[in-house]
């Protein structure tokens, strides 16, 4: 009987070096990894995972994340204060997709230019709102089913 290996790894939250390193290694080995990280934006989430993983993996952490990362979904919920207390909440999601080692997101990860990713996700989210991804968007193109 052949050995079985799980195809998907769910990790509730990455908060320490050991977990970050294991998440990066699993993703680098082709496993679909779904996890959460607390951060202010998609770049901050990636930076947090890379920074934590680097403590045990060294410089290979950024390269591994750059090659393995495919999708980041950043969610935020804010509440406005009203005269009766707290008003209605506002939900916002930002999507950042990467299509592997040659994608601009991967280049930013390897170079450590995390703040420069904002332009990439801004353009991607405009295309998502218009339901139009380009073939060069790779993952987004597949998700939106554009022909």
Could you tell me what each predicted segment is?
Residues 1-147:
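Short, flexible helix-loop junctions that flank or precede catalytic/ligand sites
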């Amino acid at each position: 009987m052949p050995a079985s290996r799980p195809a998907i790894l769910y990790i509730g939250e990455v908060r320490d070096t050991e977990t970050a390193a294991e998440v990066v290694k699993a993703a680098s080995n082709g496993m679909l990894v779904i996890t959460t990280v607390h951060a202010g934006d998609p770049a901050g989430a990636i930076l947090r995972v890379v920074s934590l993983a680097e403590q045990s993996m060294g410089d290979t952490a950024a390269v591994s994340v750059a090659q393995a990362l495919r999708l980041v979904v950043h969610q935020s919920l804010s509440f406005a204060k009203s005269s009766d207390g707290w008003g209605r909440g506002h939900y916002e999601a930002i999507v950042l997709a990467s299509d592997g080692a040659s994608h601009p997101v991967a280049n930013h990860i390897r170079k450590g230019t995390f703040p420069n990713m904002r332009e990439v996700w801004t353009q991607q989210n405009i295309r998502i709102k218009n339901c139009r991804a380009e073939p060069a968007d790779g993952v987004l193109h597949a998700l939106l089913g554009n022909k």
